[in-house]
Amino acid sequence: MLQNPELHYLDNAATTMVAPEVADVIDKAMREHWANPSSLYGPGARSEEALNTARAAVARTLGCKSRELYFTSCGSESNNLALLGAVRTRTFGKGIVVSGFEHPSVQRPLEELAKQGYDVTVVKPRPDGTLDMDRMLEHVDKNTILVACMMVNNEVGTRNDVERLAAEVKRRNSRTIVHVDAVQAWMRVPIKLTNIDTLSVSGHKIHAPKGIGALYLSDRLVQAFRPPYLGGEQERGLRPGTENLPYAMGLAAAATRLAKTMKSRDTAMRALNQRLREGLKAFPEVEINSPENAVPEVLNFSENCIKSETMLAWLAEAQIYVSSASACGRGQPSHTLAAMGKDPLAIDTAIRVSFCGDNTPEDVDAFLDRFEDGMKHLQKIRK
Protein backbone atom coordinates (compact mmCIF):
# COMPACT_ATOMS: atom_id res chain seq x y z
CA MET A 1 0.00 0.00 0.00
CA LEU A 2 2.93 2.33 0.70
CA GLN A 3 4.28 4.09 -2.37
CA ASN A 4 7.51 5.18 -0.66
CA PRO A 5 9.80 2.24 0.28
CA GLU A 6 11.78 4.53 2.58
CA LEU A 7 8.72 5.21 4.73
CA HIS A 8 8.03 2.77 7.57
CA TYR A 9 4.58 3.31 9.09
CA LEU A 10 4.25 1.47 12.39
CA ASP A 11 1.42 3.37 14.06
CA ASN A 12 -1.57 1.41 12.82
CA ALA A 13 -3.30 1.44 16.20
CA ALA A 14 -3.67 5.20 15.72
CA THR A 15 -4.98 4.97 12.17
CA THR A 16 -4.48 2.92 9.03
CA MET A 17 -3.98 3.97 5.44
CA VAL A 18 -7.07 3.67 3.28
CA ALA A 19 -6.79 0.59 1.07
CA PRO A 20 -6.78 1.49 -2.65
CA GLU A 21 -9.69 -0.84 -3.39
CA VAL A 22 -11.68 0.79 -0.57
CA ALA A 23 -10.92 4.24 -1.96
CA ASP A 24 -12.14 3.02 -5.36
CA VAL A 25 -15.44 1.88 -3.86
CA ILE A 26 -15.91 5.26 -2.17
CA ASP A 27 -15.03 7.20 -5.31
CA LYS A 28 -17.50 5.19 -7.38
CA ALA A 29 -20.20 5.58 -4.72
CA MET A 30 -19.75 9.35 -4.69
CA ARG A 31 -20.34 9.46 -8.43
CA GLU A 32 -23.11 6.87 -8.73
CA HIS A 33 -24.95 6.96 -5.38
CA TRP A 34 -25.23 10.70 -4.83
CA ALA A 35 -28.93 10.71 -3.90
CA ASN A 36 -30.26 10.83 -0.35
CA PRO A 37 -31.17 7.26 0.76
CA SER A 38 -34.38 8.65 2.29
CA SER A 39 -35.61 10.09 -1.02
CA LEU A 40 -38.55 8.27 -2.63
CA TYR A 41 -37.54 8.63 -6.28
CA GLY A 42 -35.35 6.23 -8.26
CA PRO A 43 -31.83 7.45 -7.43
CA GLY A 44 -32.79 7.66 -3.74
CA ALA A 45 -34.15 4.11 -3.81
CA ARG A 46 -30.90 2.89 -5.34
CA SER A 47 -28.94 4.69 -2.63
CA GLU A 48 -31.11 3.07 0.02
CA GLU A 49 -30.49 -0.34 -1.52
CA ALA A 50 -26.73 0.29 -1.51
CA LEU A 51 -26.91 1.39 2.13
CA ASN A 52 -28.79 -1.77 3.10
CA THR A 53 -26.24 -3.89 1.26
CA ALA A 54 -23.36 -2.18 3.09
CA ARG A 55 -25.14 -2.61 6.42
CA ALA A 56 -25.65 -6.32 5.79
CA ALA A 57 -21.98 -6.78 4.87
CA VAL A 58 -20.73 -5.12 8.05
CA ALA A 59 -23.29 -7.01 10.15
CA ARG A 60 -22.03 -10.32 8.75
CA THR A 61 -18.52 -9.62 10.02
CA LEU A 62 -19.93 -9.10 13.52
CA GLY A 63 -22.43 -11.95 13.43
CA CYS A 64 -25.45 -9.75 14.09
CA LYS A 65 -28.68 -8.95 12.27
CA SER A 66 -28.62 -6.06 9.80
CA ARG A 67 -31.24 -4.22 11.84
CA GLU A 68 -28.90 -4.32 14.87
CA LEU A 69 -26.15 -2.44 13.01
CA TYR A 70 -26.16 1.39 13.05
CA PHE A 71 -23.73 3.55 11.11
CA THR A 72 -22.00 6.39 13.00
CA SER A 73 -19.14 8.78 12.29
CA CYS A 74 -16.50 6.95 14.36
CA GLY A 75 -15.80 4.66 17.30
CA SER A 76 -15.94 7.55 19.74
CA GLU A 77 -19.44 8.47 18.65
CA SER A 78 -20.47 4.83 18.86
CA ASN A 79 -19.22 4.65 22.44
CA ASN A 80 -20.98 7.87 23.43
CA LEU A 81 -24.22 6.83 21.74
CA ALA A 82 -24.15 3.42 23.41
CA LEU A 83 -23.30 4.59 26.91
CA LEU A 84 -25.46 7.70 27.13
CA GLY A 85 -28.37 6.00 25.42
CA ALA A 86 -28.18 2.69 27.25
CA VAL A 87 -28.28 4.08 30.78
CA ARG A 88 -31.59 5.76 29.96
CA THR A 89 -33.14 2.34 29.46
CA ARG A 90 -32.52 1.35 33.08
CA THR A 91 -34.24 2.86 36.11
CA PHE A 92 -33.69 0.16 38.72
CA GLY A 93 -30.26 1.40 39.84
CA LYS A 94 -27.34 3.77 39.34
CA GLY A 95 -24.37 1.41 39.44
CA ILE A 96 -21.82 1.40 36.62
CA VAL A 97 -18.65 -0.71 36.55
CA VAL A 98 -15.85 0.03 34.08
CA SER A 99 -12.28 -1.15 33.58
CA GLY A 100 -9.44 1.26 34.34
CA PHE A 101 -7.90 1.23 30.87
CA GLU A 102 -10.77 2.45 28.70
CA HIS A 103 -10.54 4.87 25.79
CA PRO A 104 -11.39 8.53 26.59
CA SER A 105 -14.63 8.16 24.63
CA VAL A 106 -15.74 5.71 27.32
CA GLN A 107 -14.06 7.37 30.28
CA ARG A 108 -15.44 10.85 29.75
CA PRO A 109 -19.11 9.99 29.20
CA LEU A 110 -18.98 7.95 32.39
CA GLU A 111 -17.32 10.83 34.24
CA GLU A 112 -20.22 13.00 33.10
CA LEU A 113 -22.72 10.39 34.28
CA ALA A 114 -20.98 10.34 37.66
CA LYS A 115 -21.63 14.09 37.94
CA GLN A 116 -25.29 13.34 37.29
CA GLY A 117 -25.47 11.00 40.27
CA TYR A 118 -24.52 7.64 38.82
CA ASP A 119 -22.25 5.46 40.96
CA VAL A 120 -19.28 4.74 38.68
CA THR A 121 -16.72 2.19 39.88
CA VAL A 122 -13.40 2.08 38.00
CA VAL A 123 -11.49 -1.20 38.38
CA LYS A 124 -7.74 -1.08 37.84
CA PRO A 125 -6.12 -3.73 35.63
CA ARG A 126 -3.59 -6.20 36.96
CA PRO A 127 0.06 -5.06 36.86
CA ASP A 128 0.56 -6.94 33.58
CA GLY A 129 -2.24 -4.95 31.98
CA THR A 130 -4.80 -7.74 31.91
CA LEU A 131 -8.39 -7.36 33.03
CA ASP A 132 -9.02 -8.07 36.72
CA MET A 133 -12.29 -9.84 36.05
CA ASP A 134 -12.85 -11.06 39.60
CA ARG A 135 -12.64 -7.52 40.96
CA MET A 136 -14.98 -6.21 38.28
CA LEU A 137 -17.53 -8.90 39.04
CA GLU A 138 -17.33 -8.16 42.77
CA HIS A 139 -19.00 -4.82 42.06
CA VAL A 140 -21.87 -6.22 39.98
CA ASP A 141 -25.07 -6.40 42.04
CA LYS A 142 -28.80 -5.79 41.75
CA ASN A 143 -28.23 -2.03 41.28
CA THR A 144 -25.68 -2.36 38.46
CA ILE A 145 -27.14 -1.04 35.21
CA LEU A 146 -23.99 -1.04 33.05
CA VAL A 147 -20.63 -2.77 32.73
CA ALA A 148 -18.13 -1.49 30.14
CA CYS A 149 -14.86 -3.07 29.03
CA MET A 150 -12.77 -2.77 25.88
CA MET A 151 -11.97 -5.97 24.01
CA VAL A 152 -8.42 -5.02 23.00
CA ASN A 153 -6.53 -2.21 24.70
CA ASN A 154 -5.34 0.47 22.30
CA GLU A 155 -2.07 1.19 24.11
CA VAL A 156 -0.63 -2.16 25.16
CA GLY A 157 -2.75 -4.55 23.10
CA THR A 158 -4.20 -6.52 25.99
CA ARG A 159 -6.89 -8.92 24.83
CA ASN A 160 -9.73 -9.13 27.34
CA ASP A 161 -12.15 -12.05 27.56
CA VAL A 162 -15.25 -9.89 27.21
CA GLU A 163 -17.39 -12.88 26.23
CA ARG A 164 -16.74 -14.54 29.57
CA LEU A 165 -17.12 -11.23 31.40
CA ALA A 166 -20.50 -10.64 29.74
CA ALA A 167 -21.71 -14.13 30.65
CA GLU A 168 -20.68 -13.71 34.29
CA VAL A 169 -22.28 -10.26 34.49
CA LYS A 170 -25.57 -11.60 33.13
CA ARG A 171 -25.41 -14.48 35.60
CA ARG A 172 -25.27 -11.98 38.45
CA ASN A 173 -27.80 -9.54 37.00
CA SER A 174 -29.55 -10.35 33.74
CA ARG A 175 -30.73 -6.74 33.39
CA THR A 176 -27.23 -5.24 33.45
CA ILE A 177 -26.17 -3.81 30.08
CA VAL A 178 -22.76 -4.93 28.80
CA HIS A 179 -20.95 -2.51 26.48
CA VAL A 180 -17.78 -3.45 24.60
CA ASP A 181 -15.41 -1.10 22.80
CA ALA A 182 -14.14 -3.35 19.98
CA VAL A 183 -12.45 -0.64 17.92
CA GLN A 184 -9.01 -2.26 18.23
CA ALA A 185 -10.38 -5.81 18.13
CA TRP A 186 -12.51 -5.79 14.99
CA MET A 187 -10.84 -7.68 12.14
CA ARG A 188 -8.04 -8.73 14.49
CA VAL A 189 -9.74 -11.22 16.80
CA PRO A 190 -13.02 -13.16 16.53
CA ILE A 191 -16.04 -11.43 18.07
CA LYS A 192 -18.94 -13.29 19.66
CA LEU A 193 -21.88 -11.11 20.64
CA THR A 194 -23.55 -13.55 23.04
CA ASN A 195 -24.57 -11.61 26.19
CA ILE A 196 -23.10 -8.36 24.77
CA ASP A 197 -25.69 -5.60 24.39
CA THR A 198 -23.76 -2.83 22.62
CA LEU A 199 -20.44 -2.89 20.76
CA SER A 200 -18.55 -0.18 18.88
CA VAL A 201 -16.25 -0.39 15.85
CA SER A 202 -14.43 2.14 13.67
CA GLY A 203 -13.47 2.34 10.02
CA HIS A 204 -10.10 4.02 10.11
CA LYS A 205 -8.57 1.17 12.09
CA ILE A 206 -9.29 -1.31 9.27
CA HIS A 207 -8.16 0.63 6.18
CA ALA A 208 -11.45 2.48 5.68
CA PRO A 209 -11.47 6.30 5.93
CA LYS A 210 -11.85 8.42 9.02
CA GLY A 211 -15.42 9.59 9.53
CA ILE A 212 -17.23 6.25 9.56
CA GLY A 213 -17.96 3.77 12.34
CA ALA A 214 -20.73 1.52 13.51
CA LEU A 215 -22.60 0.50 16.63
CA TYR A 216 -24.08 -2.90 17.32
CA LEU A 217 -27.23 -2.44 19.38
CA SER A 218 -28.96 -5.63 20.44
CA ASP A 219 -32.64 -6.11 19.70
CA ARG A 220 -32.95 -6.59 23.46
CA LEU A 221 -32.36 -2.86 23.96
CA VAL A 222 -33.71 -1.14 20.89
CA GLN A 223 -37.31 -0.60 22.04
CA ALA A 224 -36.28 1.19 25.24
CA PHE A 225 -33.14 2.85 23.84
CA ARG A 226 -33.19 6.64 24.08
CA PRO A 227 -30.43 8.32 22.04
CA PRO A 228 -28.74 11.39 23.55
CA TYR A 229 -29.52 13.55 20.51
CA LEU A 230 -32.57 14.03 18.32
CA GLY A 231 -33.34 14.77 14.69
CA GLY A 232 -34.55 12.84 11.69
CA GLU A 233 -35.53 9.20 11.45
CA GLN A 234 -32.31 7.96 9.87
CA GLU A 235 -30.82 4.79 11.36
CA ARG A 236 -34.24 3.86 12.75
CA GLY A 237 -34.35 7.17 14.59
CA LEU A 238 -31.42 6.28 16.84
CA ARG A 239 -28.70 8.20 14.98
CA PRO A 240 -30.22 11.19 13.16
CA GLY A 241 -28.56 12.83 10.19
CA THR A 242 -28.27 11.95 6.51
CA GLU A 243 -26.24 8.77 6.17
CA ASN A 244 -22.72 8.93 4.76
CA LEU A 245 -23.40 6.32 2.09
CA PRO A 246 -20.03 6.37 0.27
CA TYR A 247 -18.14 5.86 3.54
CA ALA A 248 -20.59 3.20 4.70
CA MET A 249 -19.88 1.35 1.46
CA GLY A 250 -16.16 1.87 2.07
CA LEU A 251 -16.50 0.44 5.57
CA ALA A 252 -18.26 -2.62 4.18
CA ALA A 253 -15.57 -3.08 1.54
CA ALA A 254 -12.77 -2.78 4.10
CA ALA A 255 -14.40 -5.21 6.52
CA THR A 256 -15.17 -7.75 3.81
CA ARG A 257 -11.59 -7.50 2.54
CA LEU A 258 -10.01 -8.13 5.94
CA ALA A 259 -12.47 -10.84 6.96
CA LYS A 260 -10.96 -13.05 4.26
CA THR A 261 -7.42 -12.81 5.65
CA MET A 262 -7.78 -12.85 9.45
CA LYS A 263 -5.90 -16.12 9.98
CA SER A 264 -3.06 -15.39 7.59
CA ARG A 265 -2.66 -11.85 8.95
CA ASP A 266 -2.55 -13.15 12.51
CA THR A 267 0.32 -15.48 11.58
CA ALA A 268 2.18 -12.65 9.85
CA MET A 269 1.62 -10.24 12.75
CA ARG A 270 2.93 -12.78 15.25
CA ALA A 271 6.09 -13.17 13.23
CA LEU A 272 6.63 -9.40 13.13
CA ASN A 273 5.89 -9.03 16.83
CA GLN A 274 8.33 -11.80 17.71
CA ARG A 275 10.99 -10.30 15.45
CA LEU A 276 10.65 -6.99 17.29
CA ARG A 277 10.67 -8.63 20.72
CA GLU A 278 13.84 -10.54 19.85
CA GLY A 279 15.49 -7.40 18.53
CA LEU A 280 14.67 -5.44 21.68
CA LYS A 281 16.47 -8.03 23.82
CA ALA A 282 19.71 -6.38 22.70
CA PHE A 283 18.82 -3.37 24.88
CA PRO A 284 19.01 -4.17 28.61
CA GLU A 285 17.20 -0.93 29.44
CA VAL A 286 14.07 -1.97 27.58
CA GLU A 287 11.04 -3.22 29.50
CA ILE A 288 8.16 -4.78 27.55
CA ASN A 289 4.81 -3.40 28.71
CA SER A 290 2.52 -5.49 26.49
CA PRO A 291 1.50 -8.71 28.27
CA GLU A 292 2.01 -12.12 26.70
CA ASN A 293 -1.68 -12.39 25.77
CA ALA A 294 -1.64 -9.10 23.85
CA VAL A 295 -2.70 -9.08 20.22
CA PRO A 296 0.37 -9.32 17.97
CA GLU A 297 -0.51 -6.07 16.20
CA VAL A 298 0.59 -4.01 19.23
CA LEU A 299 3.86 -4.00 21.15
CA ASN A 300 4.39 -1.37 23.85
CA PHE A 301 7.72 -1.01 25.62
CA SER A 302 9.67 1.48 27.74
CA GLU A 303 13.32 2.16 26.96
CA ASN A 304 13.81 3.92 30.35
CA CYS A 305 16.40 6.38 29.01
CA ILE A 306 15.14 8.88 26.47
CA LYS A 307 11.81 10.69 26.65
CA SER A 308 9.32 9.32 24.17
CA GLU A 309 8.86 12.54 22.22
CA THR A 310 12.63 12.82 21.71
CA MET A 311 12.94 9.25 20.46
CA LEU A 312 9.85 9.63 18.26
CA ALA A 313 11.35 12.73 16.64
CA TRP A 314 14.61 10.86 16.04
CA LEU A 315 12.75 8.00 14.39
CA ALA A 316 10.58 10.36 12.35
CA GLU A 317 13.67 11.99 10.83
CA ALA A 318 14.25 8.62 9.15
CA GLN A 319 10.58 8.33 8.14
CA ILE A 320 9.87 5.72 10.79
CA TYR A 321 6.58 6.48 12.48
CA VAL A 322 5.48 5.07 15.83
CA SER A 323 3.75 6.61 18.84
CA SER A 324 4.16 7.01 22.57
CA ALA A 325 0.53 6.42 23.59
CA SER A 326 -3.01 6.71 22.30
CA ALA A 327 -3.38 9.38 19.63
CA CYS A 328 -6.60 10.44 21.38
CA GLY A 329 -4.61 11.30 24.51
CA ARG A 330 -2.14 13.56 22.73
CA GLY A 331 0.17 15.31 25.15
CA GLN A 332 -1.13 13.37 28.14
CA PRO A 333 0.68 10.62 30.07
CA SER A 334 -0.60 7.13 29.41
CA HIS A 335 -3.45 6.42 31.82
CA THR A 336 -3.20 2.73 30.87
CA LEU A 337 0.43 2.43 31.96
CA ALA A 338 -0.36 4.45 35.08
CA ALA A 339 -3.22 2.09 35.89
CA MET A 340 -0.79 -0.82 35.45
CA GLY A 341 1.39 0.73 38.15
CA LYS A 342 4.28 1.73 35.89
CA ASP A 343 6.67 4.31 37.31
CA PRO A 344 6.93 7.82 35.81
CA LEU A 345 10.16 7.03 33.92
CA ALA A 346 8.60 4.00 32.23
CA ILE A 347 5.56 6.07 31.28
CA ASP A 348 7.64 8.99 29.96
CA THR A 349 9.80 6.69 27.80
CA ALA A 350 7.08 4.38 26.47
CA ILE A 351 6.85 3.59 22.76
CA ARG A 352 4.03 1.80 20.96
CA VAL A 353 4.72 -0.05 17.73
CA SER A 354 1.60 -1.27 15.94
CA PHE A 355 1.44 -3.37 12.79
CA CYS A 356 -0.95 -4.01 9.92
CA GLY A 357 -1.00 -6.52 7.10
CA ASP A 358 1.10 -4.26 4.88
CA ASN A 359 4.09 -4.23 7.23
CA THR A 360 7.15 -6.35 6.52
CA PRO A 361 10.22 -7.64 8.36
CA GLU A 362 12.12 -4.79 6.70
CA ASP A 363 9.95 -2.31 8.63
CA VAL A 364 10.93 -3.97 11.91
CA ASP A 365 14.61 -4.05 10.99
CA ALA A 366 14.57 -0.39 9.96
CA PHE A 367 12.99 0.50 13.28
CA LEU A 368 15.52 -1.51 15.30
CA ASP A 369 18.50 -0.05 13.42
CA ARG A 370 17.35 3.53 13.87
CA PHE A 371 16.32 2.86 17.48
CA GLU A 372 19.79 1.51 18.25
CA ASP A 373 21.41 4.60 16.74
CA GLY A 374 19.05 6.77 18.76
CA MET A 375 19.86 5.05 22.03
CA LYS A 376 23.56 5.70 21.44
CA HIS A 377 23.36 9.21 20.02
CA LEU A 378 20.63 10.67 22.22
CA GLN A 379 22.15 9.36 25.45
CA LYS A 380 25.45 11.04 24.56
CA ILE A 381 23.65 14.34 24.03
CA ARG A 382 21.80 13.94 27.30
CA LYS A 383 25.06 13.42 29.16
Predicted stretch roles:
Residues M1-K383:
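Pyridoxal 5′-phosphate
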